[in-house]
């Protein structure tokens, strides 16, 4: 299994509340700055953030942009449905995540989310 496949599989399980694979692939000293919440997050924080946001998001297709022994960059598409929160229509975004490894474990990552003005599922098959 490639690093990208492992990363995607781990978080797809995590979106369903099973963080066992996430726990295995992340370094104990993992830290990340979460732009959505404005906090430096550790892995436990990321799990809470993911569980909370998953209630209003549908995660779609993932694509590997770059992968090496120490670095991974993946893109995914999301549908955000904030109707229950603020009454707005669903919207779509592309997320690019850069992942850094230390001794085979994820030590840091950053995600950039960019709004889209179209539904990417009309053009890209979901995986």
Tell me what each language-model feature is:
Residues 2, 41, 56-58:
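Short glycine/proline-enriched coil/turn segments at helix->beta-strand junctions
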Residues 14, 37-48, 110-112:
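Short N-terminal helix-initiation segments at or just after the protein's N-terminus
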Residues 19, 42, 95-99:
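Low-complexity, intrinsically disordered short segments enriched for Gly/Pro and polybasic residues
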Residues 29-41, 52-53:
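A short gly/proline-enriched turn/hairpin at secondary-structure junctions
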């Amino acid at each position: 299994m490639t690093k990208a496949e492992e990363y995607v599989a781990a978080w797809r399980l995590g979106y369903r509340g099973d963080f066992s694979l996430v726990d295995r692939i992340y370094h104990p000293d993992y830290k990340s700055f979460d732009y959505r919440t404005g906090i430096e997050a550790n892995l436990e924080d990321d799990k809470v953030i993911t569980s909370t946001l998953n209630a209003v998001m549908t995660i779609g297709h993932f694509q590997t942009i770059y992968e090496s022994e120490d670095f991974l960059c993946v893109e995914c598409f999301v549908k955000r449905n904030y109707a229950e929160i603020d009454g707005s229509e669903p919207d779509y975004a592309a997320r690019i995540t850069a992942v850094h490894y230390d001794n085979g474990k994820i030590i840091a990552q950053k995600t950039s989310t960019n709004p889209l003005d179209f539904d990417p599922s009309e053009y890209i098959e979901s995986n």
